């Protein structure tokens, strides 16, 4: 396995990622984001993550759900596709409990993670999908709050409290990037 390296992502790096659509672009050339977000406990996460992703200029949002969450998402953003299909990036875990069997909807959401693990496109992991961090082949960005990061690190035999992470987030971000 190749040694993992980390570097600082700058505003200049971000600017190079922004592509202004031209008259020859279409939804597929502008990117298709697969979303596995929201749950019965946190349905708003599905709606907010989908509408926020569409506001970026993304070509298509593909919401993966086997529950009533799709109706909420479609009510807010009818342009969302709610059928499985190819994606160019993933966002997973927001609004999903980290315990797979906490409720039936969460169990179903975790089953969708199997699809994510079979692909190699860039992936953003949050909340309930953080257990996949460091286990995927694809480029991965994690977005935990301090409590989620403490739980993730503890699952990797690193003892740290959320208060310690909040007191020195830069150090813990660096340590996490080296660990994962």
Descriptions of predicted regions:
Residues 1-127, 131-141, 146, 150-180:
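Small-residue (G/A/S/T)-rich helix-start motifs and N-terminal tracts that mark the onset
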